[in-house]
Amino acid sequence: MSAYRQPVERYWWARRRSYLRFMLREISCIFVAWFVLYLVLVLRAVGAGGNSYQRFLDFSANPVVVVLNVVALSFLLLHAVTWFGSAPRAMVIQVRGRRVPARAVLAGHYAAWLVVSVIVAWMVLS
């Protein structure tokens, strides 16, 4: 005789905001992988020379790729924001025996993100 298993709907997680947000964050890993692959393809095209890079630019101009990159960027931002949001709970930092407030840890992460983004933008655009 087997134990009773209550039937569960397929999209049970979509009814509660916290579960939906968790699932979207987990799905965002697919788009993080896409961006890594895209970066590798860019580097390969640049390394192969001008013609290869032009073919890559033509591929990147395809509307499907543009839409995919916009969706991936939105998921990447969700991934980063939720990652930073969990940092104050995961990192217990103490200074002089007192715990650093969660807002300070969060502000530090966002400040570092901003600095790195400015440096990368400066390197790419200059």
Curated annotation (Swiss-Prot):
Keywords: Cell membrane, Membrane, Transmembrane, Transmembrane helix. SUPFAM superfamilies: Fumarate reductase respiratory complex transmembrane subunits (SSF81343). It is a multi-pass membrane protein. Disulfide bonds: none annotated. The chain crosses the membrane at residues 30-50, 64-84, 105-125. GO terms for cellular component: fumarate reductase complex; plasma membrane. GO terms for molecular function: succinate dehydrogenase activity. It holds the Pfam family Fumarate_red_C. The keyword Metal-binding does not apply. It is found in: Cell membrane. Belongs to the FrdC family. Anchors the catalytic components of the fumarate reductase complex to the cell membrane, binds quinones. Part of an enzyme complex containing four subunits: a flavoprotein (FrdA), an iron-sulfur protein (FrdB), and two hydrophobic anchor proteins (FrdC and FrdD). NCBIfam families: PRK13603.1 (NF010126). This is Fumarate reductase subunit C. It comes from Mycobacterium tuberculosis (strain CDC 1551 / Oshkosh). The lineage of its organism: Bacteria, Bacillati, Actinomycetota, Actinomycetes, Mycobacteriales.
